[in-house]
């Protein structure tokens, strides 16, 4: 066979390219990424997915309340045997000076000579942990908790190369994960009339209302249970009134899912009605429910949302949901922020809002975040030693409690309520563990037989970002009973705002975790606020319901309780139906079809 010089040249180029390609494949095949949330057996470790937007991923948490939890285990298939370098992505969550979240890793029955979680560095990062010889292509890996005090591990990376530049930012980690785990760009879940993001009371009510009016609805929730703050994960019951509305029809769906009788941090989980709420949703033929799905990206056409992308926290696969109308019921305004919606954070100044109670200068103060807990009385005495990383209590300042109360909360402008959400949760841990250790150590006669039985690692927020609508509800509106033509949802709670407790500030300046409330008209101040607070002023097809609607910081104090947010959801569900009926935007519904909306709720 005869080849021309040109053919030979082309063949050489192809051969060289093939060698380069093989080289790249070899490099890739000589490394292994393990995401801990994909471990086959979690043991006593839990998947914590609250902080994906801040640190990049769900992770495993060893939340044992001071008692080491059972190992998490998985089997890993290596591309070849030999020596591998190891990196582990973790953090020291309480480096004061070094934290308690220590754990070890066991590979093929051999424990690494490296303790993780006590580096003295509070940031998430990759830690190089030496080398290991892999003799079996299929090898067992174990995470062994040493303390029961919230060790955490995000990912493990093995490489034949001694030097790796591993990403640590959210976007970089997502691309790295996609490449290493060979994840598809997305799986398409179809097009919906109405896409509701967030499965708290607002999201549930919005989805049910729209579905019962005939819309095809996707309800996307990033938790395994429905209910948000009122679920068994957070145990804050619903509050506010459902029978004093200007329009009595509003509140009927909220009454179906209500759990205000449960009380704060009830030990009986069934009181929070997780299963009942799930049953109601599953019985709605027009609702497709997607649990454990975290929305992290949107697709836009100008100022309209076309679709949202959500990551399944149990598989890390991405699913795409197209829609005509969207509702942000996330509480944190997550969907609104992703889409570029105008938003507010912290306290507005008196000059900005004209409110009598506003500060002279705007600031970042917000109401705080809480973690519920309780202890139970046992038959035997147990210890809970004071440790250096805990907040330190004294005879002069401690709290004799066996259960959480409403005013244990962290935030207040000392921490950013969203960006520092993991730090806030961990600060609550340090306060709760520290006070409990003081009681168990110095008041043993009274608390010796009590045992810390429950502390939620899921944190419940009161405030975060708020999206701006065509009307920004203010303190003046509520106090002066300003009557808007589109007044539609009645709040009965009164303006309830939380601030750092002054005595707590004296003992823990800048680290407050106790609040006091200003709530002069509790349950006595009815006010019906307008529909125009429930849609974005600059994103054409975005509704919102929940604590992230268009209100000032002060006005938020009146509308944030969960029966009220559920009623917002009902209105948004009706409005979404009318928008589909008339092929109009939420704003056009106000300008052109307001009377029909009011007729719907009458």
Model-derived regions, located:
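Conserved N-terminal/central alpha/beta ligand/cofactor-binding core
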Residues: 209, 215-216, 221-301, 344, ...
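N-terminal Rossmann-fold NAD(P) dinucleotide-binding loop
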Residues: 203
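Beta1/beta-strand and adjacent pyrophosphate-binding region of the FAD-binding site
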Residues: 188-200
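Extracytoplasmic
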Residues: 30-186
């Amino acid at each position: 066979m005869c080849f021309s010089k040109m053919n030979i040249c082309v063949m050489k180029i192809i051969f060289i390219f093939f060698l380069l390609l093989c080289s790249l494949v070899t490099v890739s095949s000589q490394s292994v990424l393990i995401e801990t949330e994909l471990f086959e057996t979690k043991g006593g470790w839990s998947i914590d997915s609250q902080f994906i937007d801040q640190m990049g991923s769900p992770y495993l948490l060893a939340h044992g309340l001071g008692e080491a939890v059972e190992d998490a285990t998985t089997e890993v298939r290596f591309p070849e045997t030999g020596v591998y370098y190891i990196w582990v992505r973790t953090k020291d969550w309480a480096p004061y000076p070094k934290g308690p979240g220590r754990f070890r890793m066991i590979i093929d029955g051999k424990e690494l000579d490296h303790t993780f979680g006590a580096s003295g560095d509070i940031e998430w990062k990759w830690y190089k942990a030496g080398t290991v010889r892999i003799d079996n292509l299929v090898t067992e890996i174990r995470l062994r908790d040493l303390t029961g005090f919230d060790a955490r591990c995000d990912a493990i990376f093995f490489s034949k190369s001694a030097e790796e530049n591993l990403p640590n930012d959210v976007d970089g980690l997502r691309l790295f994960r996609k490449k290493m785990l060979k994840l598809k760009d997305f799986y398409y879940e179809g097009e919906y009339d109405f896409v509701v993001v967030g499965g708290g009371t607002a999201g549930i009510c919005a989805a049910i209302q729209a579905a019962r009016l005939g819309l095809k609805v996707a309800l996307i929730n990033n938790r395994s249970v429905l209910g948000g703050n009122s679920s068994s994960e957070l145990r804050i019951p619903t509050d506010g009134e459902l029978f004093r509305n200007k329009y009595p029809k509003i509140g009927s769906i909220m009454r179906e899912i209500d759990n205000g009788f449960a009380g704060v941090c009830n030990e009986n989980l069934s009181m929070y009605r997780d299963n009942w709420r799930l049953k109601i949703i599953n019985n709605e033929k027009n609702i497709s429910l997607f649990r454990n799905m975290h929305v992290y990206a949107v697709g836009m056409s100008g100022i309209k949302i076309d679709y949202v992308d959500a990551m399944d926290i149990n598989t890390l696969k991405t699913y795409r949901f197209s829609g005509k109308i969207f509702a942000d019921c996330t509480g944190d305004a997550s969907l609104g922020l992703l889409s570029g919606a105008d938003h507010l954070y912290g306290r507005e100044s008196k000059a900005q809002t004209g409110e009598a109670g506003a500060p002279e200068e705007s600031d970042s103060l917000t109401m705080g975040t809480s973690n519920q807990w309780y202890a139970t009385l046992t038959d035997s005495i147990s210890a809970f030693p004071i440790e250096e990383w805990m907040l330190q209590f004294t005879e002069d300042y401690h709290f004799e409690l066996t259960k959480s109360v409403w005013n244990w909360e962290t935030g207040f402008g000392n921490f950013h309520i969203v960006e520092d959400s993991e730090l806030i949760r961990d600060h609550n841990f340090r306060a709760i563990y520290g006070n409990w250790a003081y009681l168990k150590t110095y008041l043993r006669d009274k608390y010796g037989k009590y045992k810390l039985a429950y502390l939620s690692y899921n944190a419940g927020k009161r405030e975060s970002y708020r999206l701006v609508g065509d009307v920004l509800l203010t303190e003046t509106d509520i106090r002066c009973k300003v009557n808007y033509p589109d007044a539609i949802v009645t709040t009965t709670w009164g303006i309830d705002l939380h601030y750092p407790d002054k005595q707590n500030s004296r003992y823990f300046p800048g680290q407050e975790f106790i609040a006091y409330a200003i709530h002069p008209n509790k349950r006595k101040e009815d006010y019906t606020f307008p529909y125009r607070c429930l849609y974005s002023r600059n994103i054409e097809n975005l509704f919102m319901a929940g604590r992230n609607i268009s209100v000032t910081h002060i006005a938020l104090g009146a509308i944030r309780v969960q029966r009220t947010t559920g009623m917002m959801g009902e209105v948004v569900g009706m409005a979404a139906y009318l928008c589909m009926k008339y092929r109009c935007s939420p704003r056009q519904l106000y300008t052109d079809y307001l009377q029909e909306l009011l007729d719907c709720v009458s």
